[in-house]
Amino acid sequence: MLKEKLIIIITLVMLLCACDIQEQSTQLAQIKAQNKIRVGTLASASNYYQAVQGEQGFEYELSQAFADYLGVELEIVPFFNLSDMFARLQSGDLDLIASGLTYNKTRAQQYRFGPTYRTISQKLVYKQGIERPRDYDDLTGNLMVIAKSSHSLTLQKVKKSNPELNWSETEEFDEEELLQAVIDGEIDYTLADTHTLSLFRRYHPNLSIGFSITHNDPIAWMLRKSNDDSLYALLVPFFGEAKQNNQLYVLEEKYFGHVRQFNYVNTLAYIEAIKETLPKYQPWFEQYAGTLDWRLLAALSYQESMWNPRAKSPTGVRGIMMLTRNTAKQVGVTNRLEPEQNIRGGAKYLSKLIKRIPDRIPQPDRTWLALAAYNVGWGHVNDARIITKQQGASPDKWADVKKRLPLLIKKRYYRKTRYGYSRGDVAVSYVDNIRRYYDALVWLDENNAIEEKPEAPVVAPKIGDEVEAK
């Protein structure tokens, strides 16, 4: 009897141990044990990159949010080609891939996809100046795409109904480098996803869209195919919460919200002005920026005056930073038409606005809110923040406030506010424009594409210029 009880006890212990061993062997258990999740991504402006402020990128921030959700550290592993990244996933060196990759049946045979969290479209692009291709029959030059990419898989599918279609593939270049090759005339065509194309056209407006290849392709994270559902099972509630609490929307707005609208003529004029006009004033932007990024100050100035020191609006704002008479007095500007004074005053005023933003609000939301205040005044921005809070959204997030600013033109909203009617819709476009100008200027500056700047010019007031007393 005692022996039988002992056997039962030993059996139960062994079963419990077996369950524990099985539990410890799951992917999620291993991640918890190591206290980190290893995420692979392609290094790019839309996924992951190193900036002055540290690590940045849509997929990086989303991956960090998932790591926080799991309660572990994030180990981001950047790659420069798909083959290496897929191989590392298959070998178990990565827990998942977060790289804005599209779902398709070919990939789904090899990998497991998480929930769809975005959609993109694929476009055929070419350089402005050659005849626009409107379908595959119009392609007369060389078309190149990345090997093993969704673009390659798409073309393989298209070729079944277009047998004359030919293209080459490469693992040496990434998507942005292929776009640059089109600009440089090294290739005639390539395919690009809409979000990458939108970011790239900020500083290369000559890149044009021939026609759409696909529409609304689903984007999802990728895992190894296995019977282990432990990690996959948590992706579903994570993305559900990210959509429910607006986290996905906020990230979309941060990285892509300001680049959805593209104007070829305006972008081309801006790039030209950076090379021809900006060098005259760049020393002053740098000198008076203080803790601000001088390139942000310059982008603000371009939005205000297109770097015209004699600019004037019907409402009485004047100069390269378009200061009102009252604002000029506040910041010690005696002549709004003198560009050095005006730049100094504009920088001082923007800094004051940023300091006025509640300390709890982090960057870059502080700056976007301050830019909106530069346009319509802090009072109106704060009215929009109050409406935002009343509607259950965050008054501290620009992505939420920008959706409510346009409500200030509607009587049923502005009559209940402290400062009343305001063109909040204009303020939203204003901030989006500055963000586009800033992004382009940063890229051109860091790639040494701005002309060498001369000594700051001395601009004497002409007869008839205003000279104001403090």
From Swiss-Prot:
Keyword Signal annotated: yes
Keywords noted in UniProt: Cell outer membrane, Cell wall biogenesis/degradation, Lyase, Membrane, Signal
Signal sequence bounds: 1-21
SMART domains linked: PBPb
One BP annotation, GO: cell wall organization
Spans annotated as LT domain: 260-470
InterPro entries with a match to the protein in the record: Lysozyme-like_dom_sf, MltF, Solute-binding_3/MltF_N, Transglyc_AS, Transglycosylase_SLT_dom_1
Region feature (Non-LT domain): 22-259
Domain notes: The N-terminal domain does not have lytic activity and probably modulates enzymatic activity. The C-terminal domain is the catalytic active domain.
Name of the protein in its database record: Membrane-bound lytic murein transglycosylase F
The species this protein was found in: Pseudoalteromonas translucida (strain TAC 125)
